[in-house]
Amino acid sequence: MGCSAFDRGFHASSEASTSGSTEPKDAVIDVQGAKERARARATMLKDKALAAQVRAMMVFDRDLVRAHRDRAAFLQQRALKARPEHAPDDLLDELARRLLDRLFDIKRDFKRIVVLGGANEAITRRLLAERDDIEKIVVVDLSQDMLDFVESVIGAEPKRRDGTPVEISYVQGDEENLPIQMNSVDAVISCLGLHWVNDLPGAMSSAAATLVPDGLFLSSIFGGNTLQELRVACALAETEHEGGVSARVSPLAHVRDCGSLLGRANLSLPAVDVDIVTMGYGSPEKLVEHLRAMGETNAGLMRRPFLPRETAVAARTLYAEKFPAPHTPGSDNAEGAVEATFEVLYMTGWRSHESQQSAKQRGSATVSLADLQKHLDGEK
């Protein structure tokens, strides 16, 4: 990707627009600030040496990520029309539920919330259905089509569980350059929205900066063991037919990285946990269709543009042979059905506040372990 192409992608993904708001100054939304930061970065990248360094650190094609989100919005809209009584995507809905379970375990109010990318339809819908404390939600996404889809599902007059109207704004923006005021929201929630950014520590730091003191950052991303079956099948097929291996699945973070990411974002009381979800599909092609509907197909800059037919057929055969979906009595498991693993990494952190628990300074203890042992021995 040339420098000019990179600049165009950055500007496009940083431009933001809001729906239903005519106020010149918003207490939460900061579109102008995002545009100014985009212009400043574009100016810096006129330095060819710096631009080359930045390009070398890029992993994902953000223009393609946006295109995938546009397509996912269309496919989810079509799925919702076909099954209006169901969620647009059952897996995204379930993973949104699991993420929000962590929010519901916290006994405090979150009046202003940013919903950032990923499964934003499921998160927004569930927040409204299950909470009574929300006053304002800002939905941020790289794709305007996805924002339009979420708005069509939520409706023109959103209300929370107790019937109170909730103000919702839909803002197109980049996760790496959030159009949100600093120190303005009580929580940032991102369900599967951050594993497609090129600067994950920077994106998390940007999100953390929008939180008020003692505000909550709650996120889930797909982990490195996601789609391990697909990786193996493609690697074996390429090795057999082409004598080498290419990146067929986008690179993802591992659980060991998450604690460090929370620390680099200056978030306190970090917590990380993992879920493994195994899904069954009628065929490898059905898996790929589902990945497209979620917006989760490969957007890596180093991806191959296509897979030769011979290799693709071999990969399909190997996948079905090595990773068949277990047959469930009474089900309609078809021959050739396969399973796929989704590893979900959950990250929780808090904006620092004096009321939070913190470790004592080294050397501040007033009782030694030896004295404590003597005391305990004396009680026996």
Residues of each region from the PLM?
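Conserved catalytic/acceptor-binding region of the Class I
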Residues: L218-K286, M294-P305
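Short catalytic micro-motifs in class I SAM-dependent methyltransferases
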Residues: L192-H195
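Class I SAM-dependent methyltransferase SAM/SAH-binding core
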Residues: D101-A187, P201-S205
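Class I SAM-dependent methyltransferase Rossmann-like catalytic core
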Residues: P24-K111
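A short glycine-rich, Lys/Arg-flanked "PGG" loop and its adjoining helix->strand segment in the class I
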Residues: P201-L216
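N-terminal chloroplast transit peptides
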Residues: M1-G2
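C-terminal lobe and adjacent flexible extensions of AdoMet/dcAdoMet transferase-like proteins
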Residues: D30, F104, A265, E285-K380
